[in-house]
Amino acid sequence: MNKMNRKFSKLLKNPHIFFRDFLNKKYPIKNTELPFAESEEANLIEAHQKLDKIIQKNTLRQSDIDVVFTWVDGSDPLWQSKYHQYAPNYQANSALYATDIARFEDHNELYYSVHAVLKFMPWVRHIFIVTDNQKPKWLDEAYQEKITLISHQDIIDKEYLPTFNSHVIEAFLHKIPNLSENFIYFNDDVFIARELQAEHFFQANGIASIFMSEKSLTQMRDRGTITPTLSASEYSIRLLNKYYNTNIDSPLVHTYIPLKKSMYELAWQRYEKEILGFLPNKLRTNHDLNFANFLIPWLMYFEGKAMPKIDICYYFNIRSPNALTQYKKLLNKKNIGEQPNSFCANDFNSQKSINNYQNQLFSFLNSYYS
């Protein structure tokens, strides 16, 4: 009875709060690819941070951790010349969105993403940026001790170059000269949103984190939209099933990915025939392998080198009206100290765009990282 009285009193005194809380409970707001409501995010992050600090106090990190970005500037005339020379010969077998201009557009996200790493992850030993002989305009001598550019030709066999297929590029990340055993892979649309400890990615005993999503690969296929990422993940599962009794149905969260060079080498040793079979695909196809974002993390898990961990990552399409809502929410969260671990400002389909989506993105990133 007292509980009912309190609710009735709340309704009379603060009807807007009453209905807000009622709706949030009945229809919880979700910003991530995890089974957690927005109201749970801050507590989850705080709990994991406290645990990481306890572990940090009782252990010493045994190895360095690097960061790897892949990046392309689709407005570069030299890159465009190569693309227009080769792409038409491979378009017939390419997958959904493989040739969409959004895949190759540069919105200067890399600048903000790299600077977020420098600001919020100062323990990172070195940053490598993998490109097709391109250089970000902002990258000057001031960064030379911390950042190294890696050209595709430095790591990818020349018979597969040029390539415009991110799955192919990601299959060679372990070839980066002087790369540490433990590294974190970023796309340039993934951003650190707050200070993060090394233990969020790798424990002192070398165990990596695997950030699983609650999404279902089976449900994705049943909906009928067959993306190259989905097909490449399903192909990866078939390879994993040759060695492990798996029932994998979860992709990973669209965020950064802790990886190990030794697990790359194991994958190449076990699956060399299948890997060599998809490397000639200069554009994404439905016959690729999803290396960095699926095969290697799950291989690490089944080899006892990774364990599940939570990463609160906001994921949205920068061309969607929802992006404006997310920008406002992220700025508000930052102001009250409840920002997520990361966010992914994704761009994959240029067919539908809000007005001034690029300026909206610039304005938000400038405000968030100012």
From Swiss-Prot:
Transmembrane regions: none
GO BP term, pick one: polysaccharide biosynthetic process
Keyword annotations: Exopolysaccharide synthesis, Transferase
UniProt-listed InterPro entries: Stealth, Stealth_CR1, Stealth_CR2
Keyword Repeat attributed: no
UniProt-recorded Gene Ontology molecular function terms: transferase activity, transferring phosphorus-containing groups
EC number: 2.7.-.-
Presence of the UniProt keyword Transferase in the record: yes
Misc remark: Stealth proteins are part of a protein family that is conserved from bacteria to higher eukaryotes. Family members were first identified in microbes as proteins that help pathogens to elude the host innate immune system. Microbial stealth proteins are involved in the biosynthesis of exopolysaccharides. Stealth proteins are predicted to function as hexose-1-phosphoryltransferases.
Function (record text): Part of a capsular polysaccharide synthesis locus.
Family: Belongs to the stealth family.
Protein name: Capsular polysaccharide phosphotransferase
Lineage, top ranks: Bacteria, Pseudomonadati, Pseudomonadota, Gammaproteobacteria, Pasteurellales
